[in-house]
Amino acid sequence: MLTAFVGRCLRGPLNQPILVRSFADFQRYFGGLWQPSTLSYALEHFFEQGGQQAIVVRIANGARPVSLTLNCGRERLILEARAPGTREFLRAAVDYDQIDALDTRRFNLVIQRVRAPGSEWIEEQETFRGLTIDADSARFVATVLEDSALVRVHGEVPAARPDRTLMPGTNLPVGYVSSSPDGDDGRPISDYDVIGSAVRRSGLFALAEVDELAFLHVPPLTRTAEVGISTLLVAARFCRERRAMLIVDPPANWMGTKDMARALKHIELRSDNAVMFHPRVTAMDRLRGRLETFGNGGAVAGLLSRSGDAVSAALTSQEPEPLLRAGMKLSHEIDDADRWLFAAHGVNVLQTVRRVPRERLPLRTLACGASASPDGSYLAQRRLALFTINAIERGTRWCLSVQDDASAWGPVTRQVRTFLGELRGAGAFASVPFDQSFLVICDDRINVAGRTPREVNILVQFAATRPGEYHSFMITHSVAHRAARVRPVLVNRLEASLIVTHQLEHEVTIRLRRMDAVNL
């Protein structure tokens, strides 16, 4: 179960999903706490509140990398850091060890990233032996450094190889050339930077290849600028397509019930793939040495992570409370009467003390109050539905490795039925009798043997919380697409047809070849 954070960081690779398992990991990759980085504080709160692993995507607005210049006789070879920003401290060493004395085109290169200028604390090192300035060689310096995580060649490669780096005042080839302080951390990020590009896999779309994504949080753009509704809408749609939950910070101006109720009447985000908690939190800012008020998204992600996986959270007799750990306070208290009003609008209330069971409210999604079904309104049920479909989609990817599609239909059906049966045995889909709790179809009624490109369709239906209602999905594995397609469907029991609902709300009817294909 992974939680993703997208935002500004002090340093680190841009638009790459990096897994961190502790705040120490975050410090190593992204530089730790930084006042302009609301993401750094959100990560600190995440791990303080019980989070165990997170995916971090660093984005920037106009950041520029530092450069490193190697003398090549009268010319210069310029390298630039892969990661932009002022806190990338690099140094390089060049030598000719084990290179033929008659070969004047080859050299060895060592690149190091150090903790600080002049420091001997090496955080990362790369060694490249037998590089050459010959553009036709497989060891051409510009080509080889394309695979470097630290630097790349900037501009043209000179006609002469780099000079050996010498220790100052000596002829000993053990010296280093340090990077210039010409980097730039860039300007504050905008909604445009967060959204990014699906084509370039930047911003939110850098997470496109991340598997097992459970939660996504976009911290405020700056200490005073909140995430815009355009970003929230794109993020909510991204989460719907990836079957994840978006954690939304409450607006900073929500200081009372009336303010909240008025704002909710005009908010444009209503999604069963989004969740919001109130109020904001107060915690120690270790850089400023005083208490500050922060968005609660990082803390919420941590407490949801420690509350257990989707199955245990949905099937437990008592849903875990949204209880903050010690060291963090609420920005203001919410009285018991107002908690019900917040809940009616799909906003959950954080707690610092436990409540008796009869006073606990089930956690809601932001679809609550928008005529959503119970499974879309309540977080535990929504997470269970998303978990079920995700598990089936991932667990059946092997079907494309079978040469004969038809020979995979039976094993796929049995595998999915076994999985759903185990969930039913654990207490899921309990609104109907066992024999009516789920349906799996993967045969010639919805598949064509020998189809090119190869494709396997799996129809899955399982009972919702309300008796007589079902969740129905068509999962399509195809060699023509890198990822499986998962489409919600409506099973028409009278006509035995499948109505496939797309994001743009148009409907396409897929007629089954047998009228009794779906006989419920």
Locate predicted features:
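Intrinsic disorder/low-complexity signal
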Residues: A24, I122-Q125, A135, E146, ...
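Short, surface-exposed secondary-structure junctions/capping segments
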Residues: S137-A160, R485-Q503
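Structured, hydrophobic secondary-structure cores that serve as assembly/anchoring elements
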Residues: M1-G85, D100-R106, Q112-S119, M167, ...
